[in-house]
Structures are given as structure tokens and as C-alpha cells.
Amino acid sequence: MPTYNQLVRFGRKSKTRKTKSPALESNPFKSGVCLVVKTVTPKKPNSALRKIATVRLSNKRTVNAYIPGEKHSVKEHDRVLVRGGQVPDLPGVKYHIVLGAYDIAGVKGRKQGRSRYGAHRKQVAATKK
């Protein structure tokens, strides 16, 4: 417990919080160029081939970003938009690629949760009366 005089001299130091996505530098999104597209296996007890891409961001940092959804159109040298968000069973993957932005198409045929996967609403034919 500090004395009153110590508080007058030094004050209280507030704790600094460590960010979970440092490469974004406090921005909600960063654009980048895709360098490599690959598949990785998750931690135990899960089993799959998760799609990730190595992306060089506009601030010259290189990060691994997860490609969400079924099927994707991400290729090498594509321009992508990256947001924060960890993948729980992939160590070292702290970012997500935003589908439907820049060179990346949204997931086709998606009916629920469309905004997360860059899918457009299916057009219903207008009926005449």
C-alpha cells in the first residue's frame, strides 16, 4: 500500500491492455496481398483441413489469416481485406479474411448468416396480379 506522499509524487499507473490483433494497429480492417494459400490441421480433439492464407498487410506485416466458409476463391497475389478474430483450434491464426471484399467472392448459395460470408440475397421473381 503506497503512502499518501508516494501517491502525490508518482500517482497510480493504469494497466495497459495487450491487444489480441497487433498487426491491425488499432484499425478494424487492413488490406493486404495474399502470398500463400494452404491447409492446416487443427489442435486435438478436432480433425479437419482448415484453409488459411499468408497475407502481407499494407503496413508490411505478414500474418496468417483464416478463410471462412465452404469453398473459396482466394488465390496467390489476390488483394484481400483482413479483420481480427482468432480461430480457437488453429494456433497462431489471429485474423480472418473478409469474404465479398476486393478480389474475394462471397460464398455461393448461402441462405443464413449471409453477411458474414459475403453472400447476396437470392432474388425472388415478382408475381403479377
UniProtKB/Swiss-Prot annotation:
InterPro entries cross-referenced by the UniProt entry: NA-bd_OB-fold (IPR012340), Ribosomal_uS12 (IPR006032), Ribosomal_uS12_bac (IPR005679)
Q: Which residues form a coiled coil?
A: none
Pfam families found in the cross-reference section = Ribosom_S12_S23
Question: What's one GO-annotated cellular component?
Answer: small ribosomal subunit
Annotated region Disordered: the residues are: 110-129
- Entry keyword annotation includes ATP-binding: no
Q: Name one GO molecular function term.
A: rRNA binding
A Gene Ontology biological process in which this protein takes part is: translation
Which positions carry the signal peptide feature in this UniProt record? none
Q: What does this protein do?
A: With S4 and S5 plays an important role in translational accuracy.
The entry assigns this protein to a family as follows: Belongs to the universal ribosomal protein uS12 family.
- SUBUNIT field: Part of the 30S ribosomal subunit. Contacts proteins S8 and S17. May interact with IF1 in the 30S initiation complex.
Tell me what this protein is called: Small ribosomal subunit protein uS12
Its gene name is rpsL
